[in-house]
Regions:
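Class I (Rossmann-like) S-adenosyl-L-methionine-dependent methyltransferase catalytic domain
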Residues: 1-78, 96-103, 107, 119-188
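A conserved beta-strand element that flanks and buttresses the S-adenosyl-L-methionine
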Residues: 88
């Protein structure tokens, strides 16, 4: 993976897009083994994933540097009443159906502090997309890769202000990403 430029891609994603601040309360949805954690400043990190093995590995690797939960962000964190400055949803949306993604965003919006942000990154279908990128998308295990409009529709009905970015230079191989930054503009 790192031969594809993933290390540089994660650094760039964290520094230029995610932009966490020291002390932020951050939720990492679909965190896997928490590979993003070494790239983050000191903050209050919670990673959640359905895969027990990923969470067990993250706990072994990072110990008390974060809180690692096996579960579903849409359900399990609601009951705790926690709120977050920053919610990262990385390479997850293209693996879930529209109705599940819409429910996820509704739940995440309730977990977001005023002026907090949800940041997503996924692969995307684009018109006139390079052949190699289309091939990589077809080979991806995610069956819900969307167009930019398709990703934006997932946030319809939320009260979030959404900005999108398209990147085609994050990895060393030709690959197109869509980034959505959804901000909770409420002040209370």
């Amino acid at each position: 993976m790192f031969s594809l430029g993933a290390d540089m891609a994660v650094k760039r994603y964290v520094n230029e897009i995610l932009q966490p601040s020291p002390g932020d309360k951050m939720l990492d949805v679909g965190c896997g083994p928490a590979n993003i954690l070494p790239y983050l400043p000191p903050l209050d990190y919670t990673g959640i994933d359905l895969n027990e093995k990923h969470i067990a590995y993250a706990r072994r690797l990072y110990g008390n540097r974060g809180r690692f939960i096996v579960g579903n962000a849409a359900d399990d964190l609601q009951q705790e009443g926690r709120q977050f400055d920053l919610i990262n949803v990385s390479a997850l949306l293209h693996h879930i159906a529209d109705d599940e993604a819409i429910s996820l965003f509704a739940a995440l919006e309730r977990l977001l502090k005023p002026n907090g942000r949800i940041v997503t990154i996924d692969n995307v279908w684009l018109p006139k997309q390079r052949v190699l990128v289309r091939l990589v998308n077809y080979m991806d295990s995610g069956t819900n890769i969307r167009t930019p409009e398709g990703y934006l529709r997932l946030l319809n009905g939320t009260g979030l202000e959404v900005q999108t970015l398209l990147l085609n230079d994050l990895l060393r191989i030709p690959y197109d990403h869509i980034i959505m930054i959804a901000r909770n503009a409420s002040q209370s």
